[in-house]
Amino acid sequence: MRIAVIGAMEEEVRILRDKLEQAETETVAGCEFTKGLLAGHEVILLKSGIGKVNAAMSTTILLEKYKPEKVINTGSAGGFHHSLNVGDVVISTEVRHHDVDVTAFNYEYGQVPGMPPGFKADEALVALAEKCMQAEENIQVVKGMIATGDSFMSDPNRVAAIRDKFENLYAVEMEAAAVAQVCHQYEIPFVIIRALSDIAGKESNVSFDQFLDQAALHSTNFIVKVLEELK
């Protein structure tokens, strides 16, 4: 099976790249694509760059050029739910934009005109990730909504404003909704699996620098387990 894995930053893709066999890397429009073998699958690993425009552009190139059957978006995120700690892993059930507001024209907050309010992750991929999370003993793995915006969430006032807009939001980051929207348009199954590098609004910038590598390790190890179970 041909599986695409997307991470925004070098720190988020480096560990998985090192695990690929027969790896070959090429750069298209500034986006780095590495093809290789892992867990019996052909894996295309994309380093997309940070933010929604980079994520949307590179995911479009990925789907057009490499034709993956499924897409997994990995990397770090800021925890939003009160039950979460740095290092925990969040599996998306749904992904939304948290910085889109066209409510003046009767759209839901976060809804892009012409698009659904949120993008549902593939149920089979979520179920498979849930199965894998049952084997995790040292870290907490949960599933829930992830929201995306082109801002790092270090401002407590901004965090509070987003809490008012979305109930049961588990994590925030800067690429997933763009990846999900492109996959929705191409009808490609996707899931987002993110490990927490910080807790949004609580000295997030300091925590991010300290725990990015830990978050990358947790998310990569979890994705390897998913690939091993994927048939």
From Swiss-Prot:
Pfam families reported in the protein's UniProt record: PNP_UDP_1 (PF01048)
Broad class of enzyme this protein falls into: hydrolase
Catalysed conversion reaction: S-adenosyl-L-homocysteine + H2O = S-(5-deoxy-D-ribos-5-yl)-L-homocysteine + adenine; S-methyl-5'-thioadenosine + H2O = 5-(methylsulfanyl)-D-ribose + adenine; 5'-deoxyadenosine + H2O = 5-deoxy-D-ribose + adenine
Matching SUPFAM superfamilies: Purine and uridine phosphorylases
GO biological process, one term: L-methionine salvage from S-adenosylmethionine
Binding residue positions for substrate: 78, 153, 174-175
Pathway: Amino-acid biosynthesis; L-methionine biosynthesis via salvage pathway; S-methyl-5-thio-alpha-D-ribose 1-phosphate from S-methyl-5'-thioadenosine (hydrolase route): step 1/2
Entry annotation: catalytic residues: 12, 198
Entry keywords, A to Z: Amino-acid biosynthesis, Hydrolase, Methionine biosynthesis
Stored InterPro entries: MTA_SAH_Nsdase, Nucleoside_phosphorylase_d, Nucleoside_phosphorylase_sf
A GO MF term: adenosylhomocysteine nucleosidase activity
CDD domains linked: MTAN
One cellular component (GO) term of this entry: cytosol
Record family assignment: Belongs to the PNP/UDP phosphorylase family. MtnN subfamily.
Record HAMAP family: Salvage_MtnN
Function recorded in the entry: Catalyzes the irreversible cleavage of the glycosidic bond in both 5'-methylthioadenosine (MTA) and S-adenosylhomocysteine (SAH/AdoHcy) to adenine and the corresponding thioribose, 5'-methylthioribose and S-ribosylhomocysteine, respectively. Also cleaves 5'-deoxyadenosine, a toxic by-product of radical S-adenosylmethionine (SAM) enzymes, into 5-deoxyribose and adenine.
Protein name: 5'-methylthioadenosine/S-adenosylhomocysteine nucleosidase
Protein's organism: Bacillus cereus (strain ATCC 14579 / DSM 31 / CCUG 7414 / JCM 2152 / NBRC 15305 / NCIMB 9373 / NCTC 2599 / NRRL B-3711)
